[in-house]
Swiss-Prot record:
Belongs to the SDA1 family. Residues 519-536, 546-562 have a biased composition (Acidic residues). Residues 515-583, 614-682 are annotated as: Disordered. Its main location: nucleus. GO terms for cellular component: nucleolus; nucleus. Pfam families: SDA1_C, SDA1_dom, SDA1_HEAT. This is Protein sda1. The keyword Protein transport applies. The gene is sda1. It is found in: Nucleus, Nucleolus. The keyword Nucleus applies.
Length: 719
C-alpha cells in the first residue's frame, strides 16, 4: 500500500525515484523502464525539433546517467547514444544541453561505464569544431581533470600517450583549413583550425606540466616544440613562452613562498610576553611547516628535467626556428615577436652549444645604440656565445659593439652597456676578444662614472681568470701573474669551468705530502706502497741526488752568474715539486680509497682554498655558459637622474595634498580663553596635592558651610 502511494507521485519526482532506485534497484525496475521510454520519446522529439523545451530532456538524461549502472541490459547503448548525440549536434544544441551531456558523460566515466580514453576521444574533436567559447572551456576543464585524476596514484602511460597524440594532432594541424564561425561578439570572422584548437592544446600541456603531471615528459616537450614552429602567432608564442618559463618554474615556486621562520617565532615566544594570539600564530606557523614537509615527502619520483634538455633534436629545432621565423622573407612577425623567438633560439644555442652561423650575421644589424630594446639583443648575443662558436663569427660582433657603444660622444650608460655586453660574450667565448681591443677597454677602469668603471674592472677580472697573458702586465694582478707559468694558452673548443676528476684532490695530495701519513691508516698505506712499488720509502719522498761539495766551484767576481744559477735551481726545484704533487694526486686517485677522514679533510681544504681565493683573488666567479642573461645585467648600475624644476614642484604639491598646514592646532577653534575650572582640572597633581590634602581633612562643620554656600549660588543662578 505504501509503495503504491509512493509510485503515484514518482513520475513527477525524478530525484526521489533516483534515491529509491539506488536503495533498491530490483523493486523499482518498472518505474525505471517507464522513465527510459520517456527518454527515448523525448530524444526523438528533440532531434526533430531542437528548439523545443530542453528542461525535461536534461532531467531525463541526468536521471538515467545516475542509475544506468543498475540496469546494464537496458542501458547498454546509452553512452554511445549520448556521444553520437553530442558529436553530431553540438553546433546547434544550446549551451545548457551541451553542458548537461558533457557532465553526464563524465559521470559515466566515473562510474566506469565508459573508459577515460573513450571519453577523451569524444571530446577532442569538439575542440576543433565547436565555435562556442563556453563549450570549449567546459571541455578543457573536464579533459584536464580526467587526466589529472588518472595520473594521481601512478602514471597512466596508455592514457597519456593517447591524449598526447591527440594534442599533437591539434597543434600540428595549423593550416589544415579554416571555417567561418560566429565570433563571441556576434560578428562573422575567419577562424583557422589552429586558432580553435591549437591554443587550447598548448594551454593544456602547459597546465599539466605545471601541475607535475607531465613534467619531465619528452612527448609533452615535442608537442610544445611543434607549437613553437606553428604558423599561428598565438600558438607559436605560447610554445616559446613554455620553453622560456619552464626552466625556472621550480625555482620560482620555491622562492615565491618561503613560509614562516619557526625558529624566529620560537625566539620571540621566549622573549616576549605570552599571549593567546602569539601562541596561535606559533601553532599556525608550525602547521604550515609540517604541511610543506609532507608535501616534499609526497613529491613524485619522476625527475623534472628542464624542457630545453628534453628536446630530441635541438640542432634541427634551432635551425628550423631560425629559418622559419627569423631568416625567412615570408615571416610576418612583429619586432617584439621576433625578439621572443630570438630569446628562445639563443637560449637553445647556449644551453646545447649548437652552431647556427646565420644567427650572428642576423644580429649584426641590430647592434646599434639607437635600436629599440638593444639591451635585449645584446643579452641574446651573449646567450648564443659559447666555446664551440668559431672566433671568426664572434670577433666582428665584439668589434662592432666596441665601435658603436664604447666610443667618445655617447652617454656613459651606453659605454657601460657595451662593455658589459662584451664581458658577457667573452665569459662564454674568451677567444672572441683580441689583445689590442682588450687593452683599450681596460683603460676605462679609471673612469669617473661608476657603471663604466665597474664594467671595465669586471672585464679585467674575467681575463685574469681565463687569459691573463692578454692583459697588460699592470692589470694582471699578483695571483694571475704567479699562475701564468703553469697555465696553458686557451685553445678553440676548450670547455671552461669543467672539473676533471675529484675537485680539490690536489689540495689533499699536497697536504699529505707536507704532513705525511698519520695514524694506522697512514702506516698501512706506506707499507702497501713499499710492497707494491718495491722501493724504499726514503726514495719515494721526492729527494733529488746532488753532487758532492768538491764539484761545486764558486766565483765571487761574477754575481750575475750566481743569480742565474740560483734562479735556475729554483725553477728546477719548483718543477720537481709540481711533478711530485701531480704524481701524488694520480696515486691518490687511482690506487687508494679515500677514508671518511680524508673526505672530511678534503672538504676543509676546499673551504680554506675558497676563503683564500676570495681574500687574495677575484671576487667574481665565472658564469656557467648555459646561464640566461638578462637585460639588467647588460645595463649595469644606473644613476638616478635629477628631476627638473617642474618635476620637483609637482612632487612637492603632491605631498601637500590632504595635509594640514604647519601651525598651532589650538588656533582657530575657540577665540576665548579657558575657564578656571578647566584650568584647575588640567593642572599637574603636584601643584594641587596640598589643597586636596587640606580638603580631605575638613571637619563636618566646614563641609556643611561649603555645601550651604554652593546651594545659595545655585539658587542665585536660577533667579
Amino acid at each position: 500500500m505504501v509503495k503504491r502511494r509512493t509510485a503515484a507521485v514518482l513520475p513527477n519526482n525524478l530525484p526521489h525515484l533516483q534515491h529509491l532506485v539506488k536503495k533498491d534497484p530490483k523493486s523499482y525496475r518498472e518505474e525505471f523502464l517507464q522513465q527510459w521510454n520517456h527518454y527515448e520519446t523525448a530524444r526523438e522529439i528533440f532531434l526533430v525539433n531542437p528548439s523545443s523545451d530542453i528542461s525535461e530532456f536534461c532531467s531525463l538524461i541526468d536521471f538515467i546517467s545516475q542509475t544506468c549502472n543498475y540496469y546494464h541490459d537496458v542501458t547498454a547503448d546509452f553512452p554511445s547514444e549520448l556521444i553520437e548525440l553530442l558529436q553530431k549536434n553540438h553546433t546547434i544544441f544550446p549551451f545548457e544541453l551541451c553542458e548537461k551531456i558533457v557532465l553526464c558523460l563524465v559521470l559515466l566515466k566515473n562510474k566506469t561505464v565508459i573508459s577515460p580514453i573513450t571519453l577523451l576521444q569524444c571530446f577532442f574533436p569538439l575542440f576543433r569544431e565547436n565555435p562556442t567559447r563556453g563549450v570549449r572551456e567546459l571541455l578543457y576543464q573536464q579533459v584536464s581533470l580526467t587526466i589529472r585524476n588518472a595520473n594521481k596514484q601512478a602514471k597512466n602511460d596508455k592514457l597519456n600517450k593517447a591524449v598526447q597524440s591527440a594534442l599533437f594532432t591539434l597543434v600540428d594541424g595549423s593550416g589544415s583549413g579554416s571555417a567561418t564561425h560566429t565570433d563571441y561578439s556576434g560578428q562573422k570572422r575567419e577562424y583557422s583550425a589552429s586558432e580553435l584548437s591549437g591554443v587550447w592544446a598548448v594551454k593544456m600541456v602547459r597546465d599539466l606540466w605545471k601541475r607535475n603531471v607531465w613534467s619531465g615528459d619528452a612527448r609533452a616537450v615535442n608537442i610544445m616544440k611543434s607549437a613553437a614552429l606553428s604558423s599561428n602567432p598565438k600558438v607559436m608564442l605560447a610554445g616559446i613562452y613554455f620553453f622560456l618559463g619552464a626552466d625556472n618554474q621550480e625555482e620560482e615556486e620555491e622562492s615565491d613562498d618561503e613560509g614562516p621562520d619557526v625558529s624566529k617565532l620560537l625566539h620571540q615566544a621566549n622573549v616576549n610576553k605570552k599571549t593567546k594570539s602569539r601562541e596561535a600564530a606559533l601553532l599556525r606557523a608550525r602547521a604550515v611547516v609540517k604541511k610543506k614537509e609532507r608535501g616534499k615527502q609526497n613529491v613524485p619520483t619522476n625527475v623534472n628535467f628542464p624542457a630545453l634538455q628534453l628536446l630530441h633534436d635541438p640542432q634541427g629545432f634551432a635551425e628550423e626556428l631560425f629559418e622559419k621565423h627569423l631568416a625567412s622573407s615570408k615571416s610576418r612577425l612583429s619586432m617584439d615577436q621576433k625578439l621572443v623567438v630570438l630569446r628562445l633560439l639563443t637560449r637553445l644555442v647556449g644551453s646545447h652549444k649548437l652552431t647556427v652561423l646565420g644567427l650572428y650575421s642576423f644580429l649584426m644589424k641590430y647592434l646599434t645604440p639607437h635600436q629599440r630594446d638593444v639591451t635585449q639583443f645584446l643579452a641574446c648575443l651573449a646567450q648564443a656565445s659559447h666555446e664551440f662558436v668559431p672566433p671568426d663569427a664572434l670577433e666582428p660582433l665584439v668589434r662592432k659593439i666596441a665601435d658603436e657603444f664604447v666610443t667618445s660622444g655617447v652617454a656613459n650608460e651606453v659605454v657601460c652597456a657595451g662593455i658589459n655586453a662584451i664581458r658577457e660574450v667573452c665569459a662564454r667565448a674568451p677567444l672572441a676578444m683580441t689583445p689590442d681591443l682588450l687593452q683599450d677597454l681596460t683603460e676605462y677602469k679609471s673612469s669617473k662614472d661608476k657603471g663604466v668603471m665597474m664594467a671595465s674592472r669586471s672585464l679585467i677580472t674575467l681575463y685574469r681568470e681565463v687569459a691573463p697573458d692578454m692583459l697588460k702586465r699592470k692589470d694582471r694582478g699578483k695571483l694571475a701573474s704567479i699562475e701564468m707559468k703553469d697555465r696553458t694558452p686557451l685553445k678553440y673548443g676548450e670547455e671552461l669551468n669543467v672539473t676533471h676528476g675529484i675537485q680539490g684532490l690536489e689540495l689533499l695530495a699536497q697536504y699529505k705530502a707536507e704532513h705525511g701519513e698519520e695514524g694506522e691508516n697512514g702506516d698501512d698505506w706506506d707499507n702497501w706502497e713499499v710492497s707494491e712499488d718495491g722501493q724504499n720509502s726514503d726514495d719515494s719522498g721526492g729527494w733529488i741526488d746532488v753532487d758532492s761539495d768538491d764539484n761545486i766551484e764558486l766565483s765571487d767576481s761574477d754575481e750575475e752568474e750566481e743569480k742565474a744559477t740560483a734562479r735556475k735551481e729554483s725553477d728546477e726545484k719548483g718543477s720537481s715539486s709540481q711533478k711530485e704533487l701531480v704524481d701524488r694526486m694520480t696515486e691518490l686517485a687511482s690506487q687508494s680509497i679515500l677514508t671518511p677522514n680524508d673526505l672530511k679533510k678534503l672538504e676543509e681544504l676546499r673551504e680554506q682554498a675558497g676563503v683564500d681565493r676570495l681574500v687574495n683573488g677575484p671576487k667574481r666567479s665565472l658564469k656557467r655558459p648555459d646561464d640566461a642573461v638578462e637585460a639588467d645585467e647588460i645595463e649595469g648600475p644606473r644613476k638616478k637622474a635629477k628631476n627638473d624644476r617642474e618635476a620637483r614642484i609637482a612632487s612637492v604639491m603632491e605631498g601637500r595634498e590632504g595635509r594640514d598646514k604647519f601651525s598651532s592646532k589650538k588656533a582657530g577653534f575657540n577665540p576665548t580663553s579657558l575657564s578656571n575650572k578647566r584650568k584647575q582640572r588640567n593642572k599637574n597633581f603636584m601643584m594641587i596635592k596640598h589643597k586636596l590634602k587640606g580638603k580631605a581633612g575638613r571637619s563636618l562643620v566646614q563641609k556643611q558651610k561649603v555645601l550651604r554656600e554652593h546651594v545659595a549660588r545655585e539658587k542665585r543662578k536660577i533667579k
